[in-house]
Amino acid sequence: MSGGKSAQGPEEGGVCITEALITKRNLTFPEDGELSEKMFHTLDELQTVRLDREGITTIRNLEGLQNLHSLYLQGNKIQQIENLACIPSLRFLSLAGNQIRQVENLLDLPCLQFLDLSENLIETLKLDEFPQSLLILNLSGNSCTNQDGYRELVTEALPLLLDLDGQPVVERWISDEEDEASSDEEFPELSGPFCSERGFLKELEQELSRHREHRQQTALTEHLLRMEMQPTLTDLPLLPGVPMAGDSSPSATPAQGEETVPEAVSSPQASSPTKKPCSLIPRGHQSSFWGRKGARAATAPKASVAEAPSTTKTTAKRSKK
């Protein structure tokens, strides 16, 4: 593997993979004088390399990763699948979100089981370029998925395929008993043991699920931010005479108070004699009034305040007698 510190490709002037970049993203060392020797041996032992979102344009300089099982190259600017034959042990390859236009140079990866080529620029499928060992394949976001009979063609060409574009190939899923009886080869990058088929698939499905949840959470956050930018209800113009929401002060409806109060309360002269007692008797004393006067007092005009002077004169005459 080239030991140059620069990530610039000598031919195209693009960004390529270097020892320095791999070390920066995937290794940590104590500061001592034997760093170079330790780095050489540790690179050879790496099983997982993450180089996503580094602006990489070219795949190269992977010869020193002899034990590599998983390679993450998503979110770069890679245009061509190349220079992977030097890592035949590779089982997990993510090239999502690049600028790849065709599937090629994958037949030298006989152990490859997971391949993510989603969100690229692939228009035409060359099914004979896919390794027969594939269990999970993701081509979503490419125009090649729109061709007639796409799913049937892919599943027919890949007899071991169990999941295509996030949808299981139902007829090929094996039972849970067979899963439990499978071997326990270990892949630390996926946090648990898995076999070359079903167990590996389970761990990869969990990895995909975490990516989906992250995308959903990002979409929800963007939606909430857009909602916060919408005008509130109180910012909208109100109809005439309608109070603002949340305003319970009396001054909020002055027009209604001025128009309706004179109509609801009538003067004693304008109302009929039978309605005077109801308008003048307070609610707190109404029950005692009915107890003293009985039913006749409800309609008798003598109960009005206007009759009070005559009652005073009668009392004065009795006192003189």
From Swiss-Prot:
| PTM sites of type Phosphoserine | S175, S182
BP-aspect Gene Ontology terms: maintenance of cell number; single fertilization; sperm axoneme assembly; sperm flagellum assembly; sperm mitochondrial sheath assembly; spermatogenesis
Any one GO cellular component localisation term in the record: sperm midpiece
**According to its UniProt entry, what is the function of this protein?**
Required for normal spermatogenesis and male fertility. Plays an important role in sperm flagellum biogenesis.
What UniProt keywords are attached to this protein's entry? Cell projection, Cilium, Coiled coil, Differentiation, Flagellum, Leucine-rich repeat, Phosphoprotein, Repeat, Spermatogenesis
The name this protein goes by in its record: Leucine-rich repeat-containing protein 46
Starting at the broadest rank, the lineage of the source organism is: Eukaryota, Metazoa, Chordata, Craniata, Vertebrata
> InterPro entries in the record, alphabetically?
Cilia_flagella_integrity, Leu-rich_rpt, Leu-rich_rpt_typical-subtyp, LRR_dom_sf
Q: Which residues form the LRRCT domain?
A: 142-184
